[in-house]
């Protein structure tokens, strides 16, 4: 891929994004060596990508199971539109929920949570059921955990 006029991203930007997704702690100098750019040129590209909202954050990837949150679930909730705002506020403060998606289909929201055990899950469901019917799926295993995005090669 050379230059994508829709996104304004060129091949070097994609390579930079690829490297940062693999290790966001790499120094400008290390990135520059891999990209054959000077550290200031790397910094300029990163700043431009940040300003355009392409790079939103630099984060650590936490193993929730190592923190005692080994039960991972998806919760689907049917919420009446008049209650969306209250529901969203409740979700923001509910322990264990780390994703909330407003979706199409029979459900209104799909949540992803990590809790300690079945008792913790039951308490969470009891809080959510006040907003409407819930359906829960326990994640038994994960076949694909892709957090690394790359462009389709032409």
Describe each model-derived feature in a short phrase.
Residues 1-154:
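A compositional/biophysical signature of low hydrophobicity enriched in polar/charged and small residues
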């Amino acid at each position: 891929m050379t230059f994508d006029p829709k996104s304004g991203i060129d091949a070097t930007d994609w390579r930079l994004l690829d490297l940062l997704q693999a290790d966001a702690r790499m120094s400008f100098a290390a990135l520059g060596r891999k990209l054959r750019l000077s550290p200031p040129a790397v910094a300029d590209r990163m700043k431009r990508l940040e300003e355009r909202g392409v790079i939103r954050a630099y984060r650590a990837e936490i193993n929730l199971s190592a923190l005692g949150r080994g039960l991972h679930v998806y919760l689907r909730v049917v919420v009446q539109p008049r209650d969306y705002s209250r529901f969203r506020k409740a979700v923001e403060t509910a322990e264990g929920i780390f994703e909330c998606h407003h979706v199409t289909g029979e459900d209104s929201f799909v949540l992803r949570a990590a809790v300690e055990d079945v008792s913790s899950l039951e308490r969470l469901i009891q809080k959510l059921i006040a907003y409407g019917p819930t359906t829960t799926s326990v994640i038994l295993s994960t076949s694909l955990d892709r957090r690394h995005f790359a462009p389709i090669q032409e």
